[in-house]
UniProtKB/Swiss-Prot annotation:
It is found in: Nucleus; Chromosome. Pfam families: Histone (PF00125). This is Histone H2B.1, embryonic. GO terms for molecular function: DNA binding; protein heterodimerization activity; structural constituent of chromatin. Monoubiquitination of Lys-118 gives a specific tag for epigenetic transcriptional activation and is also prerequisite for histone H3 'Lys-4' and 'Lys-79' methylation. GlcNAcylation at Ser-110 promotes monoubiquitination of Lys-118. It fluctuates in response to extracellular glucose, and associates with transcribed genes. There is a cross-link at residue 118 (Glycyl lysine isopeptide (Lys-Gly) (interchain with G-Cter in ubiquitin)).
Length: 123
């Protein structure tokens, strides 16, 4: 009979790992970046007594990533058209106006302007 834990049985799917030598370091998982905490903070500002499921959080995170990529791509094209090498707040604002419809664009631009003003005054 083979010693258990050392040799894989025939037809076994998992490979048997040899025991780690003393002092061996544990491998850390790569961190997954997410907008989850920020989405949660905004939710609590708007609806303090409402929660969010992990599935809904995944969908919201995907949505924020998608919008970010669209705005960044459009702003990048605008800088290329104007033969510039730096994306400024003006390009971001124009990209938002081009991507978002009507009233939503107006609100996004005003909130963005407010955030930039708050950031520059805090410096």
């Amino acid at each position: 009979m083979a010693p258990t834990g050392q040799v894989a049985k025939k037809g076994s799917k998992k490979a048997v790992k040899p025991p780690r030598a003393s002092g061996g370091k544990k491998r850390h998982r790569k961190r997954k970046e997410s907008y989850g905490i920020y989405i949660y903070k905004v939710l609590k500002q708007v609806h303090p007594d409402t929660g969010v499921s992990s599935r809904a959080m995944t969908i919201m995170n995907s949505f924020v990533n998608d919008i970010f990529e669209r705005i960044a791509g459009e702003a990048s094209r605008l800088t290329q058209y104007n033969k510039k090498s730096t994306i400024s707040s003006r390009e971001i604002q124009t990209a938002v106006r081009l991507l978002l419809p009507g009233e939503l664009a107006k609100h996004a631009v005003s909130e963005g302007t407010k955030a930039v003003t708050k950031y520059t005054t805090a410096k």
